[in-house]
């Protein structure tokens, strides 16, 4: 049995750091665990220009303690009106690492998102030409589609045609939650990859709904049936370079979660590596953890691997019920790994 696990410094390829007071509260947790993070642009207003991206990067850097070596990677928020030249300029200037496709109204802060992918094909063609990755929240928003089916329907209606139309575009199918998504990514060409969150390794939809409404287990995409959780977990722990770490850590204050219309999002940053390690350990796949956490992501993005290492050790720690005004993932639970 492995009691200590040392891996190359990992990265988080999908995180919400928010802004203002919440940014100051949560950014240090991500920066302690990860060397780099792809930071989501769904602020109010969203990050759509290079100037806005540069300013947000500066605010993140100011929120991270000076003794932590952390690089925020900024993402452009795509809208129906996005200008391809602006996206290309931000990428060329080193401001934008990638661009994010939110289907309009799919999740928190997506009201300005894209109503039809056809509206941004010119932008996507330019991104293909310059090697800029597209990050996708892969759910349809049609009212006639059941919320548990939105990811699978998105693959059929939007993602499959997009991959065919733009075979050179790097695409990250973010926070996958279904067997269909895991299979699609596994079978897709090398330019298609996926991120996987810790919560979708550990919980199914019962966590939200059994014994009462559990708002702190509510995120988008929602957790699905158990067979989907098992398929996503098998993909994560498989060693395939197509799957890598993206926490989708998404903090909301308690009163925004525990409400008649509560917000979607799970704050997992404080114990993210421990949570992932627990899943890999349970599945006898610790040998594949470094690839998932530290290697597959940068290789897909074409970025250098991090120098240095982090060490996790087998130790029981109890996750606090609250961290400030936010309830963390695994609140009140004992987990079996600790970041040294």
UniProtKB/Swiss-Prot annotation:
Keywords: Hydrolase, Metal-binding, Pyrimidine biosynthesis, Zinc
Residues recorded with modification N6-carboxylysine: 100
Family matches, as Gene3D superfamilies: Metal-dependent hydrolases
Catalyzed reactions: (S)-dihydroorotate + H2O = N-carbamoyl-L-aspartate + H(+)
Gene Ontology biological process terms from the UniProt entry: 'de novo' pyrimidine nucleobase biosynthetic process; 'de novo' UMP biosynthetic process
One Pfam family here: Amidohydro_1
Entry EC number(s): 3.5.2.3
InterPro entries associated with the record: Amidohydro-rel, DHOdimr, Dihydroorotase_CS, Metal_Hydrolase
Listed GO CC annotations: cytosol
Positions that bind Zn(2+) 2: 100, 137, 175
Pathway the protein takes part in: Pyrimidine metabolism; UMP biosynthesis via de novo pathway; (S)-dihydroorotate from bicarbonate: step 3/3
Cofactor stoichiometry and binding remark: Binds 2 Zn(2+) ions per subunit.
Active site: 248
A molecular function (GO) term: dihydroorotase activity
Subunit-level organization: Homodimer.
Role summary: Catalyzes the reversible cyclization of carbamoyl aspartate to dihydroorotate.
Family: Belongs to the metallo-dependent hydrolases superfamily. DHOase family. Class II DHOase subfamily.
UniProt protein name: Dihydroorotase
């Amino acid at each position: 049995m492995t009691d200590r696990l040392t891996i190359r410094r990992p990265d988080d390829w999908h995180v919400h750091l928010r802004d203002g007071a919440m940014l100051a509260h949560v950014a240090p947790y991500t920066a302690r665990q990860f060397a780099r993070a792809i930071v989501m642009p769904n602020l109010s207003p969203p990050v759509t220009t290079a100037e806005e991206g540069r300013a947000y990067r500066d605010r993140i850097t100011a929120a991270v303690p000076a003794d932590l070596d952390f690089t925020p990677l900024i993402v452009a928020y795509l809208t129906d009106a996005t200008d391809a030249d602006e996206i290309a300029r931000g990428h060329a200037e080193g401001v934008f690492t990638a661009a994010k496709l939110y289907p309009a109204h799919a999740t928190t802060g997506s009201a300005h998102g894209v109503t039809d992918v056809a509206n941004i094909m010119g932008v996507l063609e330019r991104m293909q030409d310059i090697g800029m990755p597209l990050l996708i929240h892969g759910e349809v928003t049609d009212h006639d589609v059941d919320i548990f089916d939105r990811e699978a329907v998105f693959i059929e209606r939007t993602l499959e045609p997009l991959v065919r139309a733009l075979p050179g575009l790097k695409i990250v199918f973010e926070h996958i939650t279904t067997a269909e998504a895991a299979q699609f990514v596994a079978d897709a060409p090398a330019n298609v990859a996926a991120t996987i969150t810790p919560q979708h390794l550990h919980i199914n939809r019962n966590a939200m709904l059994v014994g009462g409404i559990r708002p702190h287990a509510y995120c988008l995409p929602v957790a699905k049936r158990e067979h989907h959780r098992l398929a996503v977990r098998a993909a994560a722990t498989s060693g395939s370079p197509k799957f890598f770490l993206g926490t989708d850590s998404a903090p909301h204050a308690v009163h925004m979660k525990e409400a008649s219309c509560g917000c979607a999002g799970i704050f997992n940053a404080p114990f993210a590596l421990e949570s992932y390690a627990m899943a890999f350990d349970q599945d006898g796949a610790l040998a594949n953890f470094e690839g998932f956490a530290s290697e597959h992501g940068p290789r897909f993005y074409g970025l250098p691997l991090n120098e240095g290492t982090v060490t996790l050790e087998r130790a029981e720690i109890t996750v606090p019920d609250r961290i400030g005004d936010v309830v963390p993932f695994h609140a009140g639970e004992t987990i079996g790994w600790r970041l040294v």
